[in-house]
Every structure is written in structure tokens, then in C-alpha cells.
């Protein structure tokens, strides 16, 4: 079993999943993973399915050189976006695996949130392409490692309201003025 970059805060309420040496572009997968970070599991799965169907785009923020603009990126408050289909499918597969791990652990699947997702570069695979005049150029691929930690979200308890409203705290000057007014009125 490999090490994760981060361990969950509460191991009993979390589940993990990882994939190594995946033949999918690192840069596209990095952007797609950043888009679904801290999303609820069901929303992340729906988002990735929409990316495959080109109904929602993945915003490209870091690796955005030469990336075209699209109107769907406006909901992310950016202009550049793409639909990395293969990356979305790999992430969906990983989330499905993490979901089955959570189900096995007895966690409530509908309350799971993507607490941690990280994409790292894997060693490049080398191929070759043949050029004019007998030359050979490299034809590299950029695979990646992906790790996901899902955590069951705790229910937020509403703060109890006090019956009597708290009085505003006054500064020393204002307190002094109030005392002077009281003295004058007497």
C-alpha cells in the first residue's frame, strides 16, 4: 500500500482511493481535479459526466497557454476552459472506487465530500516519431498518479440564540460622555 500525501483527519469517517502510472495527460487531469476539489461526491460525479457530454467545462487556470475561451467558463469566473474527456473518465472511475470503499466501510455515501485530491507527475513514457532527413524526435507521454480522500461531512449545528440581546460595548470616551450627561441632567 502506497503512502498518501495527506492522511485524513478522522480515519473512521474517511475513505481513500488512488491510481498510479495512469496513461492520461497530467495537465488536463490536474485542472479537472482542481475543479472538483471540496465538492460533494454526487455533485462531482454529475460535473464530470457533464464534462464528458460537453455540458459543463473544466476551467483551465494554471496550464492555460493556448487554451481557447468558452462561455461555460464564466460560472467559474474565468474565461478559458476545455472538456478533457479522458481525464474526466479516469477521475470518475477513481471516485467510483472510493465510493465503493466508503460503502464497504459503512459510511453514508450521500454525505461524502472530496476532502483531498492530488495529481502528481509519473515517469514519462518514451516513443519516437520519424522526421525528414533520417532524424528521429521523441514522442513522449505525460502519465500521472492520482489520489483521492473522501470524508463524511459532519452536520452543522446551528448556534443557539440568546433570549436577551447582548448590549453593545462602548468605548471609554463614550462611557465618559454618558456619565457627564447623567451628571448634567441631575
From Swiss-Prot:
It comes from Phlebotomus papatasi. It comes from the Eukaryota. GO terms for cellular component: cytosolic large ribosomal subunit. This is Large ribosomal subunit protein uL22. Belongs to the universal ribosomal protein uL22 family. GO terms for molecular function: structural constituent of ribosome. The keyword Ion transport does not apply. The gene is RpL17. Residues 159-186 are annotated as: Disordered.
Amino acid at each position: 500500500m502506497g503512502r498518501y500525501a495527506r492522511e485524513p483527519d478522522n480515519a473512521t469517517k474517511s475513505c481513500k482511493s488512488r491510481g498510479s502510472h495512469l496513461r492520461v495527460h497530467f495537465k488536463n487531469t490536474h485542472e479537472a481535479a482542481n475543479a472538483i476539489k471540496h465538492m460533494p461526491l454526487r455533485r462531482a460525479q454529475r460535473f464530470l459526466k457533464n464534462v464528458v457530454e460537453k455540458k459543463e467545462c473544466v476551467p483551465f487556470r494554471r496550464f492555460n497557454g493556448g487554451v481557447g475561451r468558452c462561455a461555460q467558463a464564466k460560472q467559474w469566473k474565468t474565461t478559458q476552459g476545455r472538456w478533457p474527456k479522458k481525464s474526466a473518465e479516469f477521475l470518475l472511475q477513481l471516485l467510483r472506487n472510493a465510493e465503493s470503499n466508503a460503502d464497504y466501510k459503512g459510511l453514508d455515501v450521500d454525505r461524502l465530500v472530496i476532502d483531498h485530491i492530488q495529481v502528481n507527475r509519473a515517469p514519462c513514457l518514451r516513443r519516437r516519431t520519424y522526421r525528414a532527413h533520417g532524424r528521429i524526435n521523441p514522442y513522449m507521454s505525460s502519465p500521472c498518479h492520482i489520489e483521492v480522500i473522501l470524508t463524511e461531512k459532519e452536520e452543522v449545528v446551528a448556534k443557539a440564540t440568546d433570549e436577551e440581546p447582548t448590549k453593545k460595548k462602548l468605548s471609554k470616551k463614550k462611557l465618559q460622555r454618558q456619565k457627564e450627561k447623567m451628571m448634567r441632567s441631575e
